Amino acid sequence: MYTLVLLRHGESTWNKENRFTGWTDVDLSKDGIVEAGRSGRLLNEAGFTFDLCHTSVLRRAIRTLWIVLDTMDLMYLPVHHSWRLNERHYGALQGLDKRETTEKYGKEQVLLWRRGYAVRPPALAEEDPRHPRFDPRYAGLGPDALPATESLEDTLARVVPYWKNSIAPEVKAGKRILIAAHGNSIRALVKYLDHIPDNEITGLNIPTGFPLVYEIDKDLHPIRHYYLGDPDEIRRATESVADQTSARK
């Protein structure tokens, strides 16, 4: 049996402001820093250690990983960064307030944009300064790899090859791996590992700052998965993610 740990980054500044973030490179909020430290302590208390780590190229995930490794006294571990683990690109929604967007377009439409499988938000214009072609961290990628918007299906299409080519062989070699990533890149990987049907993925929400442990067999099929942490806190955090588009009261 192999063990893999998935961790959504701690709360970001735009999570706190309830904005669509996507590939925008915002940092952790003060609460997010606390959540990252809590994740490290939970892993320590449960007896986990790791051989290597994977994360995205966005600072909220990178900093979460740094804090976890520092808390666990594992700062020396090798860390692999890949844009393929980035958050889903939210296109022209990036930077917009989620509740205001819901009031403008309707809850059903925004739910499809946020949690649907194949629906893409409105795309960024190619000349928009938020487009990833203007970001030097993606300079080595061809234009076809740079999204102006993504559905979860698109996100899965870039996450799964990274899993198959870079992570799965390490898992099979017995490496103990921690992946610090984002809500939708983790949703994509969970969908793939658990064979969640397209029409059921809408209901899957990943809370910030709680380690998600997967026990998997020799063929990389999940045996079971569970969160580390207080069940009531995990439930409230998960409900909070689902409730981000509720109208103001």
UniProtKB/Swiss-Prot annotation:
Catalytic activity: (2R)-2-phosphoglycerate = (2R)-3-phosphoglycerate
GO biological-process terms attached to the record: gluconeogenesis; glycolytic process
Enzymatic class: isomerase
Keyword Disulfide bond: no
PROSITE patterns listed in its UniProt record: PG_MUTASE
Site (Transition state stabilizer): H182
Keywords: Gluconeogenesis, Glycolysis, Isomerase
Recorded superkingdom: Archaea
Binding site for substrate: 8-15, 21-22, 60, 87-90, 98, 114-115, 183-184
Keyword Ribonucleoprotein among record annotations: no
GO molecular function terms listed in the Swiss-Prot or TrEMBL record: phosphoglycerate mutase activity
EC number: 5.4.2.11
Active site per the UniProt annotation: H9, E87
Residue ranges that the Swiss-Prot or TrEMBL entry lists as coiled coil: none
Pfam family, one: His_Phos_1
Pathway assignment: Carbohydrate degradation; glycolysis; pyruvate from D-glyceraldehyde 3-phosphate: step 3/5
InterPro entries registered for this protein in UniProt: His_Pase_superF_clade-1 (IPR013078), His_PPase_superfam (IPR029033), PG/BPGM_mutase_AS (IPR001345), Phosphogly_mut1 (IPR005952)
NCBIfam families: pgm_1 (TIGR01258), PRK14115.1 (NF010713)
Similarity comment text for this entry: Belongs to the phosphoglycerate mutase family. BPG-dependent PGAM subfamily.
Main function: Catalyzes the interconversion of 2-phosphoglycerate and 3-phosphoglycerate.
Record protein name field: 2,3-bisphosphoglycerate-dependent phosphoglycerate mutase
Species annotation: Methanoregula boonei (strain DSM 21154 / JCM 14090 / 6A8)
